Structure formats: structure tokens, C-alpha cells
Amino acid sequence: GENEINDIQACLFENGLMTAVYSNLDQTSDSYSLKLKSMSGTLYMLANTADLIDLQQMKESGMTEQEWLNTTIKATDGKAPRFFAGKLNLDEQPQGQYVLPMTLQHGIARFDLLMRAGGAISIKSITLKNLAQASYLISQDEVRSPEGADVQDLQFTFDQPLLKDTLGLAYVCEQTNTDLM
């Protein structure tokens, strides 16, 4: 489903450098936990990115936090990967706090089709034009597309015409795109 988590990993940045990677998080029902050695730096958590993002390799290459924030994720054949990301500034947390909740956010945008008309409507196909094919892994302060991101049209043809509202028609890279049609 849309909110399904298949894998989860995290990384810690201290003084602008990636210093730790966490890939085997403890899971209980719908929550994951990890133990931190100290309460400093910024913790980032990713879900459903294990096949896309190699945190260990990034750490070994000496990745800076600024490089991390500029990391992009790309659509494959017009399909954006369904991932989640979250961020927690540990320096801002109250001292003595042992459990720190982090909410993960969807890293993609969802298109829903809502049909509103006075008569009957049936839709056989839909084309989304000029979709950006990359987005930032970690949400920026405001939604924006990576510079130079490829664009592509995405067409949906339905075996049976759509006759009613359809949720989750398309999942695309998060973007600001005045050319999207």
C-alpha cells in the first residue's frame, strides 16, 4: 500500500559530516527505534530507499550535510520511487529525553482524479505533460525541483474507462513546475 514500509535506514550528521549509519533498526508493530551514542547533530531517516541510497558508501566517501541535502532521487520509466524521509535536530531536543519521535513524510506527490460534472463522464486516458523526473531526497524549506531535472510526459490508458473518482492515479517526483500540464 501507499504507506507500506519495506526497509528503513538512518544516518547522523555531526559538525556537517555524516558520522554514523543505522540500517538494522529495531521494529515493534508500526514503529522503529535506534540507540544513539550522543544527543548532538542531525538525524535523518529514510524508508524504502535501501535499493536506491547506499548510506554506508556515502559515509565512507566523506559526504557533507550540504551534499546530502542536495541529493536527488530519480524516477524510473516515469515512476517515482515511493519513499519516506524525516529529519530530527538532536541539538534542539530537551536534555534527558529518552524517546524522540520522528514523523516520516512521503517523498513524492500523488495525483488524484476527482470527477465533477452535471452529466456522466468517462475517461479513457490521461496525459501529464512535462513532469520533472527527479526530486530532492530530503524536502527543501520550500518545494522546488532540482536544477536541470529531466522532464517527461506520462500517459495513462485505462482498459476500462474511469467512471468515478480515482485516488492515487499517479505518484510523481515532488516538484515546482510551471510547465506541468
Describe these PLM feature segments.
Residues L90-G96, L104-R110, L114-S125:
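Secondary-structure boundary elements
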Residues D51-Y98:
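Structured interaction patches on ligand/partner-binding surfaces of diverse proteins
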Residues E2-K59, L114, G119-M181:
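Tryptophan-paired
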Residues D30-Y32, Y98-M102:
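Short strand-edge motifs at loop-to-beta-strand transitions and within beta-strands
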